[in-house]
Structure formats: C-alpha cells, structure tokens
C-alpha cells in the first residue's frame, strides 16, 4: 500500500540514525511495524529508512518526520509531499563509502564506521553521517553489493575511500540542515516562508502578482546562529551559498571594492537559485552621513543598486546579519531591499536543551549526563556558548584518559576509545570555565552562597524569596494571577549585617546570572561614558536573563540630585538608572538588588514603587540569629568541650555577622598560636648553625681573595716564593680558625636528628608525610657528613703545608688552592640547602602541632576582649527609625509586642 504524507522535521534524537517516524494510526493503515523498512519517494529521488512510531501529537496530521539527510536523498524539503510504502530489502555484503571532504584515517576506522551505521538502510548516492568525538563526518554511498537498498549487518564489509566524491566537491551548497539549528523554531518558520518558498515555488508569487522578497536582515547578539540559519536555508532550498565578509572585498584601488561586490552578485544570478550572505553587514554598509571614508559611501550605494537590480524573482536572495542594526544605512532597511527583519534572540530553556542535544548528538555521553539540568543552569548562554561548553566537557574527558594513551603509537587501542565517555562531572567542571558571551564584558560571578550559609535573618530571607526567587522560578504563576513582580529591592542596614551575602544567596538559589556593580567602575571622566556604562549593564543583563544586578553601596552611585554644581555626573547617572528601571519591559527577568548603609542620602525617586519596590532593613542579628551565625562560622572548627555557643551568643549583643566571623577567626588564630608553641631542638640547633655559617662568610671571602692573589703570583713561575707561601698558610689558617666551632655546631645538629625521627614516628601522620620526613632527615645527615669531611680535609691541608718547605712547586700550590676553593664553595652552597631544610622542618612541626588543635573557651574570651561590636544601640535606633519612615520594615514597637529582642 502507498500513502502520501507531508514531510516534517525530525526530532533531535533521531538525526543521523536513518529513521523515519510516522504516527501509530498511519503505520497501522500502511501495515507497518516498528523496525520495518520504508521507501520514501519524492519528485527528485528516493530515500530508504527504518520506521518507528511517532508521538500521539502527530496523530491525524498525515506527516512523516525525517532528518535533513533523508530529505536530501529524497530531494524534498519540509512541507513537501512524499509517497511512502513498505519494502523488503536484502542484507549488504559490501558497502563502499566516500567522504564529502578530504580526510585521513588510520587502521580500525572502517570498523568504527561500521559500528556506527550498523542496522541502517543504505542505497547508492545516499548520505550518512558519522559522529566522531563531537564532530559529524558526512559520507556518500558509492556502491552497494548487492545493488539497490540494503541493510548493514555484522557480516557487511565496509570499505572507505579517502578521496571525496567529485560531484560533492564542486557544489557550493552548505551541509547544514534545519535539525542542526536548535531553539529557533519560529525564526526558521519565518525565514522559510520568506526565502525557501519563493525559491522552490515561484509560481505562487506569480499567481498573486507580487514580487518575492529580495532580502532578509537577521538581527541578534553574536553566537545566536544567524550564519548557521542562513546556511541551513541555502541547503534545504538547494541554493548555492555565497558569503561576503567585509575585509575580503575591500581593495586599496578606486572602484575595485565595488567591482568585487558586483562579481559576487553576477555569479549568484548565473548560478541561481542562490543565497548571498553578508556577515556583519554593518561593517560594510554603515550610515553614509556618519561614514568617515569615501569607500564606505560608494560601497553602500553599490549595494543599494545591486539589490534594486535583482531580477531573479526570488531566485537570488540577500541575507544580512548584524548585532548593530541601528548602525546600518537607513536606505537598506526599507521594503524592496531588506524586506523583513528577523530578531534572533538568546534561546530559552527549551531552546538550550535542543542546542545541547545537537552538540552532544555525536558524543559518547555517560548515563549520568542530564541535559535538562544543563539547560536549566545555562541562563544567558547562546548557541556558540553551549557549543563551547560541550567542547570543553569533551576536552576534559580527553584529558582524563590522556596519561594512559601512547601518543607516539600509530593507532589508539580500541578499548581506550570505547571507554572514552563524557560525564556529568566533565560538564560541571566545564561550566566553571565557560560563561555567557554577553557577560564577558561585565563583572559576573556565579555565587556559591546558599541560604543555609547565612545565619538568622529569616524574615529578610523570606522577603527576598518572594520578591526575587519566586518571580524568576515561577514566572507563569505571577502572570496567571496578574501580579507584576518587583523590579528592585533595596537592602539597607549597618555595615557587616550580610547585605552582599544575601544578594549572592538569592542569585544562587534562583539560578540566575549575577552582575556585581561597584561605583568606581561606573564613573568616567569622559562625557556620557558613565551613563553608557549603566545602559550597557542593563542591556547585558536583559540579554542573559534571568539576571540579578547587584549595586553595592548604591548611595555612591545614586545620591540625591541637585546637591551642588559638582554633582552633574552623578545626576546624569541617577537619571539613566531611573530610565532603565522604568524601561524594563515585562517580563524581562531582570531584578535589581541594591545595598547601602545610608538610605537617607539616596535619591527619593529610586525608592518609589515601580523602581526599587521593596525596601528591606537588614538588622543586627538577635540572640537566635547570632547562635546560627556562630554555628556557621564554627562548623569546620575543632571546638573544645568547654565552648558553649549559646553563652557566646548571649555575650555578643550588638555584634553583626561580620563581627562574629572576625571573633571566630581571632579565637582560632589564638589557638593555633598557642599550639604551635616553641620550636623543636633540631630547629634551634640548625638555626644556630645557619647563623654561624652566615657570620663566617666574610672570613671565607677574605681567604678567597688571598688565594686568588697567590694564584696570580705563581702563574708565571714554577714555584712559590716565601711571601706567597706565607700568604697561602695565612689564608688556610683563617679558614681553620672559624671551622672549629662550626664542627661543634654540626655535631650538635646531628644529635638532634634521631630525636626528630622519634617524634615523627610517634605522631599520627600520613604514610607519605612520614616518608617525606625520613627522607629529609637522611638528606640533612648527608649534607652535615660532607661538611665534616670538608673540615677534616682542611686540617689535612694544614698538616701538609707544615711538612713542606718554603720552596713549593706551582703544581702543589695549585692543588692546595683548588681543594681550599672547593671547600669554601661547598660551605656556601650548603648554607642555602640548610635554610630550605629548616623551612621544611618548620612546616612539619606546624602540621604535627596543629593537627589536633582545639579552640577553647578561653580563646573566645580573649577574642571578645579584642573584637568589639561595630554597631552601637544608638546607630541601630537610627536604622529602625528610617525603616519606620519607609514603612516597609518591622518596627521596634511590633518587635516588642511579639516579645523579640530589641537593640
């Protein structure tokens, strides 16, 4: 039975697998079962696929879902009608494939390709795609044995040719399909009706008596898929694709730039249907009244003339791409030239998931990889960012197995390739390195602060959840009940109460991007630059929404206007800030959080509803909150049994969160200082030896000068004279005079080495740390032994000199001097080695002495004497009064009624 069905695009998971999906009712009508082979006949060719059940949402629509490769094989596009019937096929004995572009492959690659296409149905001329570590390679079936459509089995012999097929080499049609584009369903639909429809069915427009569109302008941030969309349209429409990049057509000769542009348009018309794609069109067609050079003006005029002169009735279409549409010459943006402007925006969650599915399509993913989670956490990521994320995750997986790979070998073992998997941990690590493109120019953080990291402040946390987290996480609920979420929140209170920490926590818990803005970064000496900085911050935030903009110390950025003549710049910044807050259209998913300890000097216009809707007092913590803060800051500390956190919470009335953190840190430092105690005896003796060797370095230098003098004097003669002999004895005598005490100090250090090892063996150190200490002791023994040996050599030299007469040969003198110089050199280099050993011993002592350090009650009591509360009762009363004025915080009277502690 044969049935006509309408072609629809494939699901992402089916791309490249050679399968077609038909709804269950149509399959039953055609007598098909899942796994059967069907023939898909289009007007220009046939394709063969394995059929599977479609989803119920397709029921009654009469559609067949096939990917771009099957559509090309059948010579059809989305929306065309094809004839579908069940066919019987034979098993392939041999299949010969050729790439569409030159490639080189090593031994074993044919088996790899065979595993990838196992079970697929192939016919001569059909295309198949093979995923290799995230990259898709396209092959064309050159021949099959037996002829006709065949299924690849375990017994099929697959042969690969290295040379690409000739007809593929000559084409200018890009190898991109609509399934390679994620998150742009609506945009693809618009572009198809503007470009693909006139190219494939010009008779429709002739019947209506209208001119088909000549141009489409794609507008959107970099990396959103503008170029990819243009390539996909060209491929699906079967059009030749010509790319114009500004620098390539520019020439230093007058008129040659316009000539280059004309040639491209002429070639496109000759080879119609064609698509001319002008990337970053704002670079070659800027506003003529603002253009600085004559070349740009002439180029714009030429482009206008060429677009007006297109006669192909939809067979030649110009697609321009830009992220700066307002920089384009207005004459280009009228109907008849660029008829339609399509905005390619930042993808939403579903769009991000589609893009991730595309880029992980050819990756060996581990079972723990959750693309839904990745789509949730990649707010603000465009397609290029998600591609970079997948690539970075794959590189991390590769780095993990790299040590076990012999890079010099001709071929990587099959078991290594089979075990190469990209895990969820690889993606999580990659997320730390890859950030949204829109956020790279602004200070952006991914805060790692959670609600449980903030002690107390339960009322403030709840208000922030309601004002920020709920609208971002459950936007549809607010839309349903018709409530506009707050645009901004002002946190005010004394310094150190946790305002910045709260902003970070709400950004983290809501899963939003976080832009931190500080006053000095905003202000510029150039007129208009400060306001521009504010505009850019909000633009970037909207682009990477959901996003939280955090203005710390906002009183420095937005003080009351009109104070004096010198405040002109800040007045303009305030005006710009007000405009941006009012201009945030619904729903933009951008929330402003500001923090200050001086709300009284902020411009009142900022604090009205519709701008900073919520004004929340962040108070000094009460006793319960202080206890929570103590628990947070001491959770990783080794507290003694006598430490009572409840008692400490009572004693720290008026302390802010920052004060309590400083208190805990000071108590810990006191405990560490006490536990480290006195240095070990080996350290004392070794330091004495080092100090002594440093003190005698001057004697060594003086002896070296005298030795050099003797060398010069005896260089020309065969023997030394009496004066030179005496000078030599004098130099060696100086060295001996200082080395006798050195030997005693060396022996004193040697005695302590065994004691040092006894201490190390008693302590509960890691085996590696004990091994390191033992190696250090052996190294020290070796150095000290060599130094003692050198001292003995000096004594031997002195004895030798005493037995010699004053007439000594030059050779004997030379030997004595060289030996003495070696001894001096050895002592000098040993000094640095001994210093390094001393540092290592100190480091070991710190590990040993602080291993079981406990922070006691007395340490906290001493710290309390040192760390005083930074906020007085009078200060807190001022903040409570301000809170009552704003009418948006809990008053003192209400707290008293509820029996709460009041500062």
Curated annotation (Swiss-Prot):
CDD domains: RecA-like_CDC48_r1-like, RecA-like_VCP_r2. The keyword Nucleotide-binding applies. Keywords: ATP-binding, Nucleotide-binding, Repeat. It comes from the Archaea. One of its GO terms (molecular function) is ATP binding. ATP binds at residues 220-227, 493-500. Gene3D superfamilies: 1.10.8.60, 2.40.40.20, 3.10.330.10, P-loop containing nucleotide triphosphate hydrolases. GO terms for cellular component: cytoplasm; intracellular membrane-bounded organelle. Belongs to the AAA ATPase family. CDC48 subfamily. This is Cell division cycle protein 48 homolog MJ1156.
């Amino acid at each position: 039975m044969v049935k006509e069905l309408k072609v629809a695009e494939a699901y992402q998971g089916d791309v490249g697998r050679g399968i077609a999906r038909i709804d269950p009712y149509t399959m039953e009508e055609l007598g098909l079962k899942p796994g059967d082979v069907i023939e898909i006949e289009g007007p220009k060719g046939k394709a063969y696929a394995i059929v599977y059940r479609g989803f119920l949402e397709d029921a009654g629509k009469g559609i067949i879902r096939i990917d771009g490769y099957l559509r090309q094989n059948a010579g059809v596009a989305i929306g065309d009608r094809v004839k579908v019937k069940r066919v019987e096929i034979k098993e392939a004995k041999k299949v010969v494939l050729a790439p569409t572009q030159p490639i080189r492959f090593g031994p074993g690659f044919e088996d790899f390709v065979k595993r990838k296409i196992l079970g697929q149905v192939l016919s001569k001329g059909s295309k198949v795609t093979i995923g290799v570590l995230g990259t898709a390679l396209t092959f064309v079936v050159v021949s099959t044995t037996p002829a006709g459509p065949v299924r690849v089995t375990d017994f099929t012999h697959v042969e690969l040719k290295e040379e690409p097929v000739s007809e593929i080499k000559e084409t200018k049609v890009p190898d991109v399909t609509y399934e390679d584009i994620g998150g742009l369903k609506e945009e693809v639909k618009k572009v198809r009706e503007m470009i693909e429809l006139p190219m494939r069915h010009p008779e429709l427009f002739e019947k209506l008596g209208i001119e088909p569109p000549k141009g489409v302008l794609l507008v959107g941030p970099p990396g959103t898929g503008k170029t990819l969309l243009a390539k996909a349209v060209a491929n699906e429409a079967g059009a030749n694709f010509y790319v114009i990049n500004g620098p390539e057509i520019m020439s230093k000769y007058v008129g040659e730039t316009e000539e280059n542009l004309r040639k491209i348009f002429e070639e496109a018309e000759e080879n119609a249907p064609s698509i001319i794609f002008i990337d970053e069109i704002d670079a070659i067609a800027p506003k003529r009244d603002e253009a600085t050079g004559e070349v740009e003006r002439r180029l714009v005029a030429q482009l206008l003339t060429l677009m007006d002169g297109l006669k192909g009735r939809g067979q030649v279409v110009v697609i321009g791409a830009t992220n700066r549409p307002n920089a384009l010459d207005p004459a280009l943006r009228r109907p008849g030239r660029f008829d339609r402007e399509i905005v390619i925006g930042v993808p939403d969650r579903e769009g991000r998931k589609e893009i991730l599915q595309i880029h992980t399509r050819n990756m060996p993913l581990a079972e723990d990889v959750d693309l839904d989670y990745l789509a949730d956490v990649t707010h603000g990521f465009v397609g290029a960012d998600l591609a970079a994320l997948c690539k970075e995750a794959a590189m991390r997986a590769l780095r993990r197995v790299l040590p076990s790979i012999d890079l010099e070998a001709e071929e990587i073992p099959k078991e290594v390739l089979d075990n190469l998997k990209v895990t969820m941990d690889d993606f999580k690590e990659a997320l730390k390195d890859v950030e949204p493109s829109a956020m790279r120019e602004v200070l952006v953080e991914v805060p790692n602060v959670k609600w449980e990291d903030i002690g107390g402040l339960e009322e403030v946390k709840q208000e922030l959840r309601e004002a920020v987290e709920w609208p971002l996480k459950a936007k549809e609920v607010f839309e349903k009940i018709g409530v506009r979420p707050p645009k901004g929140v002002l946190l005010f209170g004394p310094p150190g109460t946790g305002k910045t920490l709260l902003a970070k926590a709400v950004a983290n818990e809501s899963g939003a991007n976080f832009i931190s803005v500080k006053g000095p970064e905003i202000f510029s000496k150039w007129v208009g630059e400060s306001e521009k900085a504010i505009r850019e911050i909000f633009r970037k935030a909207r682009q990477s929404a959901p996003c939280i903009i955090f203005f710390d110390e906002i009183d420095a950025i937005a003080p009351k206007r009109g104070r004096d003549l010198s405040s002109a710049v800040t007045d303009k910044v305030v005006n710009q800030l007000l405009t941006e807050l009012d201009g945030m259209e619904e729903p933009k998913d951008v929330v402003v959080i500001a923090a200050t300890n001086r709300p009284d000097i902020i411009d009142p216009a900022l604090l009205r509803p519709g701008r900073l809707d919520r004004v929340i007092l962040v108070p000094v913590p009460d006793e319960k909150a202080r206890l929570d803060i103590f628990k947070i800051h001491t959770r990783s500390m080794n507290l003694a049994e006598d430490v009572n956190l409840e008692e400490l919470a009572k004693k720290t009335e008026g302390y802010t969160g920052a004060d309590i953190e400083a208190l805990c840190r000071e108590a810990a430092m006191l405990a560490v200082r006490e536990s480290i105690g006195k240095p070990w005896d080996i350290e004392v003796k070794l330091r004495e030896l080092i100090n002594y060797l440093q003190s005698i370095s001057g004697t060594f230098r003086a002896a070296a000068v005298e030795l050099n003098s003797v060398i010069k004097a005896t260089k020309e003669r065969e023997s030394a004279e009496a004066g030179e002999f005496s000078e030599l004895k004098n130099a060696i005598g100086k060295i001996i005079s200082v080395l006798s005490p050195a030997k005693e100090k060396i022996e004193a250090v040697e005695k302590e080495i065994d004691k040092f090892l006894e201490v190390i063996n008693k302590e509960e150190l890691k085996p590696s740390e004990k091994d390191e200490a033992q190696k250090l002791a052996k190294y020290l023994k070796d150095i000290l032994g060599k130094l003692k040996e050198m001292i003995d050599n000096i004594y031997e030299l002195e004895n030798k000199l005493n037995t010699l007469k004053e007439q000594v040969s030059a050779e004997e003198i030379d030997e004595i001097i060289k030996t003495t110089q070696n001894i001096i050199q050895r002592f000098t280099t040993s000094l640095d080695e001994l210093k390094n050993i001393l540092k290592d011993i100190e480091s070991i002592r710190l590990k040993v002495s602080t291993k079981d350090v406990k922070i006691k009650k007395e340490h906290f009591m001493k710290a309390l004497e040192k760390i005083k509360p930074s906020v007085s009762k009078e200060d807190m009363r001022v903040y409570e009064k301000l809170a009552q004025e704003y009418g948006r915080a809990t008053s003192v009277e209400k707290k008293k009624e509820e029996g709460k502690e009041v500062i």
